[in-house]
Amino acid sequence: METELSETILPTVTKMYVCGPTVYNDAHIGHARIYVIVDLINRTMNKILNKPTHLVMNVTDIDDKIIRESKNKGITWLELARLHENSFFDCMSKLNVTRPDSVIRVTESISDIVLYIQQIINNGFAYIVSDSSVYFDSIEYKKAGYEFSEIDDEEEQQYESLLSKEIVSQKKHHKDFALWKGRSESDVGFNVEFIFDNQTFKSFGVPGWHIECSAMIKKTLGNSIDIHFGGIDLKFPHHYNECLQANAYHHPMYNPLHQSDTMIFHTWTREFIHVGHLCIKGQKMSKSLKNFSTIKEMLDKINSNQFRWLFMSTKWKQQVDFTDGLISIAKELDFTVVNFVNRVSNYPFEVSDVEFNDKETLLHDDFYRIQQRIYSYLTEFKFEMVARSIQHLIGTTNVYLDLPRPNESIVGKIRDYLLDLLDKLGFIYRVGNSSSSHKIKDLMNILIETRSQLRQLTRNPDLSPGIKKQLFDILDRQRNIQLPDIGIILEDSKDSSLWYENSCVQSSE
């Protein structure tokens, strides 16, 4: 059911849907990986590939977990849901994840969900049991010619364990799953009606987990979508059952028996994109296992750029172990960019250095090749290769800057290209307004000249070792502590020094 992305199938506006949070607790960094990757893909399509998108996200704000957790905390389920929904979007904002074009709550879509279920009943693919629950009819679905998996749904089995044997025995097939869960009037739920076998059934209950997304996609995006996002754990049964429901709702639109051999086979969702698990020591990070760090906790340790590098530097389809080493890689990537932009922005280029010789030609050609390579990687959403290419481009340019009389124009173009690319990918780097007035430059030139004279003095063989050490200590403290504290970076070479302001920072926006 999952296929590779193909640019040729994407329409003028790509309709996309991502399964959003179930808001009963704070979001963890496993969730962050999913939504940052979705954001990277969405930004790439819109800002780099020039493919407009319309992204919808649902919020599951009524669920057994929400009800259970609200009782534990002594607040209403709605209070708990709104609390964690606000927390989730606050975290997304801090990660610079673009808000979806449409955010839709389950509680605001009950009537749409009921209509969706009713159509499945009308098409003969659902039935009602004595507690007014509605079940998907897998036997009729298979009879109609649709493929059907016999793999067990653990979540459905867990739900059934809470039901009476009488209700379970009314299921036509053990694979039938709940579209609507009937509840006692004393429980949390909604009053709705269904028509089955020409009879009206009043039901108090809540939607089944899978039906929410199918119905809300229909409400917001129509009969079909182009790309459906989610974590790999949603591939089965959630996304699988969504497809069953959509096929049953639209029957016979997506039935292979009703499509001619000459036409392209139509499916409800053209592409599923599943993001791999973020693991702790090989075990999936999850709220139920309590082996996770929340996004809020991690934002106290790393900034949003480092968060984004964290997920860009690995293959997003694969399972990844979350380690200190992974955090170090992300911090190093962030430092590499900041250091490079600072160096270029404050490099003391000479106005006369406008030559374009062999070394400039080599850098220019390498720059062009890397640009083409990065674009190619972005068309395939190979973000880890983009990260490597950025590192390579910075490394190549830094080597060039170490040569005599570098050309400001080409180096500036590389810096501007990287800043523009990173901005489009959702990073927040800002080059601050340089405070390097002529007076500051004059002062720094005097300081550098004084340092040079003192360093020359230390080479005097008549100078005592004790005095030499004191001079070196003063010079080192000045370079390593005092100047960085006021935002100035000083780099000493054998006979001279280079200075620049630390002007590239993560924006506080």
Curated annotation (Swiss-Prot):
Residues the entry annotates as binding Zn(2+): C19, C213, H238, E242
Catalyzed reaction equations: tRNA(Cys) + L-cysteine + ATP = L-cysteinyl-tRNA(Cys) + AMP + diphosphate
GO function terms (MF aspect): ATP binding; cysteine-tRNA ligase activity; metal ion binding
Alphabetic keyword roster: Aminoacyl-tRNA synthetase, ATP-binding, Ligase, Metal-binding, Nucleotide-binding, Protein biosynthesis, Zinc
Tree of life domain: Viruses
Record bears the keyword Metal-binding: yes
Gene3D superfamilies found in the cross-reference section: HUPs
Protein name per Swiss-Prot or TrEMBL: Cysteine--tRNA ligase
Organism: Acanthamoeba polyphaga mimivirus (APMV)
Chain's gene name: CARS
